[in-house]
């Protein structure tokens, strides 16, 4: 009764709940079984019909519903009867409006409602009046959670109105107008007009309406041309929302329905091919069709002379090649990008190229060059003036540059600075609230550097966070990468069986799909796990596979570790006297690490060679190998490798 009175008084300041009215209100609430929604409908009607008329109308309805039966009316029938009563009281234009508003899956704006009801000019004023009336009658709700004016229907009312829409055979026409409205809303925007954080949030709010429009468009009763255009136009919103799997699935469906005679503009065709080609980098779907799609997108961009699009598509090609271990090709793409960046004329584009070059160099091995590239971006990067350079995805270039700077610093032997930069990259990413940037900071820097420095607690926490992001955004790439990192963590903890099995499963999947992500590093971890189980032959085969992958694609930053581990495995096989082969591998690891400027890996190789010298009772030589390398370190003395080196030096006889 309090709900009824509050609602009635809100709509009619003269409403009185005293005297006989109180008993009438009680009777109405009893009829409605205390169902809040039904009570709101009835209270809303008192402002126009009066209390007695509402009570009488409901009495008549329920008398018909329960005539001939002694049982009480079920609660769902009570609500249905109330809805019928409220709907029948509406004038015909409002009935039609309510039916059509049910098309919207996630609320609507006035222009959207007007387009779905009737796309004729001048209809908005009539629709606005009708919506206001339906709000007054509690059939439509004003959405107060957004800055723009939106309304929605409660699901109970929407389901009821959809039934009515179907009964009037109006669903097909309404869905067509609905899909055409959203196609126009997004396709009419210039590709350089999206503003991340401003209208992107407004557009992602429409995602359920877009999903409904696309489902209809590609149905047997739909219009595939509308669906193809809408899919292509909505790509930036999917990327902004960090929904790569959905973007790939939707673009794949659109590509399968794309016909040569369709009226789809060249820029939108280009955008569709670009999205289809880029998304496998996040979803781990086959890489070769993705490269073909990007090649087609690049040709279209060149055809229309769109430099910004050429830049973005080349960036996509860099992503595909760098994440599939093709560092040679990735570096060549950065050279193409540099040429286009100069023509684009936006300084941030050139800095982005510098960041990509630094990433590629770091994976190839020259860590000082990689560090210089990353430091330059961290110091000088500013947000691009071209809006489209940020509309394609939520990446903060400074965050990613700082993450790669952290890796370069670790390889160079600056573990504490590396940990600081990794932490800063994550903090900056979290301030932007860009999930893609957060995920990259976690996978590239925080998790792996924690593993490399022996901070297993931080590694565990950051890998868990990476999994949470991968799950929330249905992003298989991060999930697979997270499981590889988890496998590496398990091996370091000594859980060899679980760790090597997890790595084996994930790397086998990656290989089948054409995505050997960070193969040399993860193959090294897997080989260590197999060695821990005593499966030396299989561990050696895994090392050889890692070295072959590094040689093929140019991802050589972990070659010193693979060479060192091969030497350790030779020693453990105990076939004859494997010292000579092990010495060669340890010496090769030292040479490669020194050439790359990887002091951290030089120390590991020196430790292995020094241990060998100890077993040969050549203690002075062991000290001569280890001391000069240990003395080059200026920080990180609490990390696992430096503790091991110090322990060995202290144990050697003087």
Regions found by a protein language model. Give the residues of each.
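Generic helix N-cap/helix-start motif at coil->alpha-helix transitions
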Residues: 398-400, 439-440, 477-481, 517-523, ...
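Aliphatic-rich helical/repeat scaffold segments used for oligomerization and domain docking
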Residues: 1-246, 252
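Inter-helical turn/loop elements of alpha-helical hairpins
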Residues: 141, 163-348, 352-380, 406-420, ...
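Intrinsically disordered, low-complexity acidic/Ser/Thr-rich segments used as protein-protein interaction/activation
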Residues: 267-269, 346-347, 383-398, 430-436, ...
